[in-house]
Amino acid sequence: HFYNFSGGFKYKGFEVNFLFQGTGKFSRCISGVGAYESEYQGVFTDLHLQAWTPERWNNGEEIKYPALSLRKSTNHQPNSFFIMDASYLRLKNAEIAYTLPVNICRKVFTERIRFSLSGQNLFTIDNMRSKFIDPEVGNMGTFQPYRVYNIGVSLTF
């Protein structure tokens, strides 16, 4: 289930616009650099910090990853452990803007002056087991969506 919703409002020269997007009831099998500890020259991520060890098991610590290994084993085959809930809600775009009153604009020989601050991928709420896995991408070896900020000035003469 994919969804998005957008909206905005204007009030006395101020303007706010936003776009949320996400998925619901969606699972993804993670892969790539960092998913398996012995692949790709041994790249480790936060997934591996809570791997099974006899000591951790005996101490009653929370186990979130199978035992680490330097050789391929059943841990490195596709299995249900690597299937994650990829449902998410992301603030994909947001913009805050202010348009100066006409009487001020005319003093500087313009019809309209608008200042804006916008951003993309500002925050995401998800259930992924690692901060290095984006639910939209699903592959640890791929660049995650960048958080981008823009400042703008629009002049109309």
Q: Can you annotate each of these PLM segments?
A:
Residues 13-17, 103-104:
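Repeated loop/turn-to-beta-strand initiation elements of outer-membrane beta-barrel proteins
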Residues 6, 55-157:
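Membrane-interface anchoring segments and C-terminal beta-barrel signals
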Residues 5-14:
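Long hydrophobic segments that form regular secondary structure
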Residues 15-85:
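Surface-exposed, extracytoplasmic segments of Gram-negative outer-membrane nutrient-acquisition systems
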Residues 1:
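Active-site beta-strand/loop architecture of penicillin-binding DD-peptidases
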